[in-house]
UniProtKB/Swiss-Prot annotation:
General function of this protein: Catalyzes the attachment of glutamate to tRNA(Glu) in a two-step reaction: glutamate is first activated by ATP to form Glu-AMP and then transferred to the acceptor end of tRNA(Glu).
This protein's name: Glutamate--tRNA ligase
Keyword field: Aminoacyl-tRNA synthetase, ATP-binding, Cytoplasm, Ligase, Nucleotide-binding, Protein biosynthesis
CDD domains according to UniProt: GluRS_core
Organism expressing this protein natively: Chloroflexus aurantiacus (strain ATCC 29366 / DSM 635 / J-10-fl)
Recorded name of the encoding gene: gltX
């Protein structure tokens, strides 16, 4: 896996700038699986140094989303650890980063830049006008003695601190997912990036690297969008004389049509949305593990323990993964069908409560009734949010002209009068029924078909609409049993009355 000795230590270090993107969960999951497979530690660190994009409550959303999926951490903001604090703003307040930036300044490997944003914009515009495609900033202060820089700063001028990148030579690093091949970047293609903002707050490039070193991170697994920034990180590791971690840049997740990456700005992929729609955490866990990783190219349904046992970094693919909502939905259906009736009822209950079909808290009677209905939808359910609609007619009145159009009662090749006759016969037969179980109801209604010399389809279809208000519903005899004798007969009577007005 790598030449690094000792326990594997990996981290997920999100920025609290909004809801956690499903791609972020994939990054966290791969790090978590790596830690669990190799017997290491998984660390959660909140990188909140971007004050402008900081969203209050986002850090809590990140933690809640990870826990919902089933990802826990060995060290982090709420569980502590030997290398805390695990929130960058708190680390900044403790002065953790200052000695390291001072070290770079003293060594002439970083410098204070007094170039303003306006001047920088003018330089970019001038470069563009001159036909220079890639503007690379090198501040004039990079050649100033440190004493002069400090004098300028003491005068009150605002400044940033920039990395003094070499003008010559090349920077090399390896990426485990890209076969360990060496990636070579010419240093004259780099620029002097900002390490410390004018507010004194460190930027990602600097803060994450110091934190990774101090927290003894051995493997840096992150999205491939960070590959172009890695030369700067490698330079910093080398400037400090620190051992480099193993870099493993995860493949992008493309939209289903392959046109661009999944985006939390353009695509409905906030983790919370999948939870709201009724995707099981087991589904998300399993599906995301397959976004850029494969066990044998065939096996797809795997438990947490199986994924931990089978996961290796060598099986992560460098080519982009492709998001497939239909496949995710199908997988969710598979996991739903793995649940027992009682387990599914418990998962469905909050959705029924939000729909106003069941009280909150639910009574024992309500729970028992829901459990009795679950077998009717267990095989059909693919998202838990579908349950209230599928079960609504068991809880709400079915009224002709409101719930459904009375004309929907009429089967093909039948008229209203013929349908009234069918439903009257059904109402009469069921009125005499005392055993209201699915087998007994089926026996009675099939016998009625023979007596009337009609095919089951038209009669059963008309009864189904009368009872449920729909042409598609769970099996008819189970539905009648679930609705109950009194309500079933009442709905049949209402359907007959409505049809008589059409006849």
């Amino acid at each position: 896996m790598s030449s690094i000795e000792g326990p594997v230590r990996v981290r997920f270090a999100p920025s609290p700038t909004g809801s956690l993107h499903i791609g972020g969960v994939r990054t966290a999951l791969f790090n978590w699986l790596c830690a669990r497979h190799y017997g290491g530690q998984f660390i959660l660190r909140i990188e909140d140094t971007d004050e402008k994009r900081f969203v209050p409550g986002a850090a809590d959303d990140i933690s809640a989303s990870l826990r919902w999926v089933g990802i826990d951490w060995d060290e982090g903001p709420d569980v502590g650890g030997p290398y805390g604090p695990y929130v960058q703003s708190e680390r900044f307040e403790q002065g953790i980063y200052q000695p390291f930036i001072n070290q770079l300044l003293e060594a002439g490997l970083a410098y204070m830049s007094f170039t303003t944003e306006e001047e920088l914009a003018q330089m970019r515009a001038a470069a563009e006008a001159a036909g220079i495609k890639a503007f690379r900033f090198r501040g004039p202060e990079r050649d100033w003695p440190l004493e002069r820089q400090r004098e300028e700063a003491a005068s009150g001028k605002p400044y940033t601190i920039r990395l003094k990148t070499p003008l010559e030579g090349e920077t090399r690093f390896r990426d485990l997912i890209r076969g360990g091949d060496e990636i070579v970047v010419q240093n004259n293609q780099l620029q002097d990036i900002v390490l410390i903002k004018s507010t004194g707050m460190p930027v990602y490039h600097f803060a994450h690297l110091v934190d990774d070193h101090l927290m003894k991170i051995t493997h840096v697994m992150r999205g491939e969008e960070w590959v172009p920034s890695t030369p700067y990180h490698v330079l910093l590791y080398d400037f400090f004389g620190w051992p480099r971690p193993v870099f493993a840049h995860l493949p992008a997740i493309l939209r289903q049509d392959g046109r661009g990456k999944l985006s939390k700005r353009k695509d409905d992929v906030a983790t919370q949305r999948f939870r709201e729609r009724g995707y099981l955490p087991e589904t998300i866990f399993n599906y995301l593990a397959l976004q850029g990783w494969s066990y044998d190219g065939v096996t797809e349904i795997m438990t947490r323990d199986e994924l931990i046992a089978r996961f290796t970094l060598e099986r992560i693919q460098p080519s982009p993964a492709r998001w497939n909502p239909e496949k995710l939905r199908d997988m969710n259906g598979i996991y739903i069908r793995k649940l027992t009736t009682e387990q599914l009822a418990e998962r469905v209950l909050p959705f029924m409560q939000r729909a106003g079909l069941i009280g909150d808290p639910a009574s024992e009677t309500e729970r028992a009734y829901l459990i009795s209905l679950i077998p009717l939808i267990h095989e059909r359910l693919e998202e838990l949010q579908e349950a209230p609609d599928l079960l609504a007619f068991f809880y709400q009145d079915v009224v002709p002209g409101e719930t459904y159009n009375p004309a929907d009662l009429i089967p093909k090749k039948h008229d209203a009068a013929q349908t009234v006759a069918l439903l009257r016969a059904a109402h009469e037969a069921l009125s005499q029924q005392t055993d209201w179980t699915p087998p007994a109801l089926e026996t009675t209604l099939r016998a009625l078909c023979e007596q009337l010399q009609v095919k089951p389809g038209p009669l059963f279809g008309a009864i189904r609409v009368a009872i449920t208000g729909r042409s598609v519903a769970p099996p008819l005899f189970d539905t009648l049993a679930g609705v109950g004798r009194e309500r079933s007969l009442s709905r049949l009577a209402a359907a007959i009355a409505a049809l008589e007005n059409l006849a």
